[in-house]
């Protein structure tokens, strides 16, 4: 992502568009996620992959379900993705909370910091800052 794209001078980056597409694919309307969150997600993905996203689509597809679950909540996520996907993402979130320093944990904390986490998710998983 180049510097000018971050500030909208050249429009939104291809990576942000790919993340938007991945979020749409799991039922999360991109407008529900602030651009600052999207840019941070992309930076977290890059950091996890050594500074470069080798496969942008695969990386975004890995992040999108966690973002969608945190923002939409269990019911809406399940409506869009089915019960098996819901159980899988809930297991990922439980694991992330137990581990504490995983990429999934960072995605969940990011939605919490941005105040876009669905309240029932906060309550169910006892998410809190600090």
Where are these regions (language model features)?
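N-terminal functional modules and adjacent low-complexity/disordered segments of proteins
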Residues: 2-4, 14, 67, 72
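Short, aromatic- and cysteine-enriched interfacial helices/patches
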Residues: 3-11, 129
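Short terminal alpha-helical segments
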Residues: 8-57
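Charged, low-complexity interaction regions
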Residues: 28-34, 49-57, 75-81, 97-107
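Short, hydrophobic/amphipathic alpha-helical patches that form generic packing surfaces
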Residues: 58-76
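Loop-to-transmembrane helix junctions at the membrane interface
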Residues: 62, 81-84
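Amphipathic alpha-helical binding modules
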Residues: 83-130
């Amino acid at each position: 992502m180049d510097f000018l794209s971050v500030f909208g001078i050249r429009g939104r980056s291809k990576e942000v568009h790919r993340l938007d597409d991945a979020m749409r694919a799991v039922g999360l309307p991109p407008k529900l996620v602030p651009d600052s969150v999207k840019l941070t997600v992309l930076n977290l993905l890059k950091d996890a992959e050594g500074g470069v996203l080798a496969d942008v689509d695969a990386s975004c597809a890995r992040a999108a379900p966690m973002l969608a679950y945190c923002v939409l909540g269990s019911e809406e996520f399940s409506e869009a993705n089915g019960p098996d996907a819901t159980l899988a993402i809930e297991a990922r979130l439980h694991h992330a909370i137990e581990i504490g320093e995983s990429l999934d944990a960072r995605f969940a904390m990011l939605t919490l910091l941005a105040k876009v986490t669905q309240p029932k998710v906060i309550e169910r998983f006892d998410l809190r800052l600090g």
